[in-house]
């Protein structure tokens, strides 16, 4: 903004004659001065005189409004004000009409006694309204809005933004509209205050995270968006190079290599709110294409020190932003090994709000005569609850729906005996052993899942969740955190039978080089860890492999020779020749964090411009075709 020379003369005049910044400078903001002086001049005067309230002066220096709606109060009664916003609703009460005017901050009722003012006024127009602030009749107070005791009697309405088309949906009920329509008209959907509040909330959480990390001594450093493609992880989004024919950049799936290189560079603590790009399918808790992480890394740090940082920042954020009355797990968080998680919860993302636990009864049933259990992994869940025949039928339907052949169970009767289809296959002499093994007592029901180990764990986890939800056992109003650690370093592809990395290839194997050289790869654990909250994976992290000799061996086991390591991860390979420090970190997901805090079931509700489930931007039309000229410039020809 530029301030005209004549206006600077006026600023000097006001400064000379009214250094206290009282009456005259405030008089400048009267409506007649709005058109005499530019916004730049008014802004300059406001900041020359600190006596003007900061909140109001920032909204007073333009011709469209004197103040935003949340700042109109009973102190303004009988004053003339100009306000601006969108026409949310128009109501005709016979002789007098009302407009509900909405801006980003609040809604205010406007009284129209001159019907000619409403000529050409439509819902969702952007308007500026001038009038007198009045006290509402007490019986018309609206305690649901900040301006509920006042209204503006209009004597001038200016249309600032016309509505040329019929609205595709009602703004106030946009969340009830089909998702594809909402996403196509996202700029209208975001006018819905509930939708907008999610984005405002997101901004506040991110600001808090930045502040917290800075207070903890971390430096915010941005890493490149255009980088080299790497063979691990999900599919890359690739970007063709114009200057280098046949070569491509990739959008980063995470700032993994760059943040490790920062540690090699001598930085001690790094963080950023990092955009990450992965060409993978959508889920309720995973947005396709792009997502954001609170990415951080620490030099000369152990796993326990990273745990402490993760606990401090997440506990602080959740305690600050959780809905009123919610409990948040205090540090230190429970630590559950991957093996324990798969056994007791049937998943590596355990929901600790569910009190049910899974038991392994495989060995016991090898002594019984029930053929479907012999030679299989058998899991059991004990539940103390009254369950009707109808409940059992619905649970069986659920079980078959997820692929189970059936769902065995036993009920413990008043006399301590068992009732159920499996009872006759348990010899009497083994029933006391079974009672001790399962901890079962009168009123309990024990459900059984049997299959190969991985499938049995999956089925047990699904049944545990279904039981917890349908029996209303899930703890309410709580955020329950835990760490899951000791993940397997390697896994075998069931189809190719080849050994590959289970998760992050840059993790340090437990036992170091000795383990890599002497142990079965499938028995080697990694210093990898997740943070899980209410069954949602919030973060992954690891102690990094900073020893080149260990890294070469780890990649060799996963099928990559040293030349591939040099080619695909050349920067790390070379940097680690020059004294790489031990380092570790993690990256909590910002989108998932906000989804949990807002109680949303779909992650797209907390993203300003999300793609749909097919990774399409319905509003802007991405992905889109490009011209032949654009393709030629990057040396690409599209095949049919």
Predicted regions: what they are:
Residues 13-14, 29-32:
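N-terminal basic, low-structured, amphipathic or hydrophobic segments
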Residues 13, 21-23, 43-46:
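Short, low-complexity S/T/E/D/G/P-rich linear segments that nucleate or cap local secondary structure
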Residues 13-16, 38:
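Serine residues within intrinsically disordered or low-complexity segments
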Residues 23, 27-30, 39-41:
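Gram-positive cell-envelope targeting signals
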Residues 34, 40-59:
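Short, Lys/Arg-enriched N-terminal segments with co-localized hydrophobic residues
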Residues 53-640:
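Class II aminoacyl-tRNA synthetase catalytic cores and aaRS-like
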């Amino acid at each position: 903004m530029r301030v005209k020379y004549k206006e600077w003369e006026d600023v000097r005049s006001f400064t000379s004659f009214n250094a206290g910044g009282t009456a005259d400078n405030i008089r400048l903001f009267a409506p007649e001065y709005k058109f005499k002086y530019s916004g730049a001049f008014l802004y300059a005067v406001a900041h020359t005189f600190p006596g003007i309230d900061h909140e109001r002066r920032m909204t007073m220096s333009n011709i469209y409004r004197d103040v935003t709606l949340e700042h109109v109060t009973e102190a303004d009664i009988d004053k003339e004000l100009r306000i601006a916003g969108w026409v949310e609703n128009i109501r005709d009460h016979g002789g007098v009409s009302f407009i509900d005017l909405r801006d980003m901050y609040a809604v205010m009722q406007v009284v129209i006694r001159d019907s000619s003012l409403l000529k050409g006024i439509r819902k969702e127009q952007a308007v500026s309204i001038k009038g007198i602030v009045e006290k509402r009749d007490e019986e018309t107070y609206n305690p649901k809005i900040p301006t509920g005791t006042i209204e503006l009697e209009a004597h001038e309405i200016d249309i600032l933004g016309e509505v040329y088309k019929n609205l595709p949906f009602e703004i106030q009920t946009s969340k009830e509209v089909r998702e594809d329509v909402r996403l196509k008209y996202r700029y209208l959907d975001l006018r819905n205050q509930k939708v907008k509040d999610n984005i405002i909330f997101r901004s506040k959480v991110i600001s808090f995270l930045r502040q917290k990390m800075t207070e903890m001594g971390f430096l915010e450093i941005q890493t490149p968006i255009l980088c080299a493609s790497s063979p691990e992880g999900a599919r890359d989004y690739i970007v063709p190079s114009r200057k280098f024919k046949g070569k491509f950049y990739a959008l980063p799936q995470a700032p993994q290599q760059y943040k490790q290189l920062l540690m090699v560079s001598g930085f001690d603590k790094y963080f950023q709110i990092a955009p990450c790009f992965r060409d993978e399918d959508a889920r309720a808790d995973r947005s396709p294409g792009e997502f954001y992480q609170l990415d951080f890394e620490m030099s000369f740090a152990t796993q326990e020190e990273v745990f402490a940082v993760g606990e401090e920042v997440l506990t602080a954020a959740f305690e600050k932003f959780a809905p009123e009355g919610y409990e948040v797990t205090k540090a230190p968080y429970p630590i559950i090994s991957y093996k324990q998680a798969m056994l007791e919860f049937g998943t590596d993302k355990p929901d600790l709000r569910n009190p049910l636990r899974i038991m392994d009864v495989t060995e016991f049933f090898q002594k019984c005569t029930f053929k479907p259990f012999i030679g299989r992994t058998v899991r059991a869940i004990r539940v103390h609850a009254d369950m009707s025949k109808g409940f059992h039928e619905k649970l069986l339907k659920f079980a078959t729906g997820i692929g189970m052949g059936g769902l065995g169970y036993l009920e413990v009767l008043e006399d301590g005996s068992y009732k159920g289809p499996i009872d006759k296959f348990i010899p009497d002499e083994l029933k006391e052993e079974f009672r001790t093994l399962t901890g079962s007592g009168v009123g309990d029901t024990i459900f059984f899942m049997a299959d190969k180990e991985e499938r049995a764990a999956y089925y047990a986890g699904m049944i545990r969740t279904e039981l917890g939800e349908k029996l209303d056992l899930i703890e309410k109003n709580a955020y329950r955190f835990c760490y899951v650690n000791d993940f397997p370093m390697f896994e075998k592809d069931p189809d190719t039978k080849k050994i590959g990395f289970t998760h992050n290839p840059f993790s340090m194997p437990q036992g170091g080089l000795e383990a890599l050289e002497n142990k079965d790869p499938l028995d080697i654990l990694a210093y990898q860890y997740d943070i899980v909250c209410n069954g949602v994976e919030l973060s992954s992290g690891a102690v990094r492999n900073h020893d080149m000799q260990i890294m070469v061996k780890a990649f060799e086991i996963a099928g990559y020779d040293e030349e591939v390591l040099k080619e695909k991860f050349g920067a790390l390979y070379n940097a680690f020749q020059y004294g790489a420090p031990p380092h570790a970190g993690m990256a909590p997901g910002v989108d998932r964090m906000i989804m949990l805090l807002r109680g949303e079931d779909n992650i797209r509700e907390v993203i300003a411009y999300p793609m749909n489930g097919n990774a399409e931007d319905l509003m802007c039309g991405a992905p889109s075709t490009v011209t032949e000229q654009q393709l030629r410039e990057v040396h690409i020809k599209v095949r049919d």
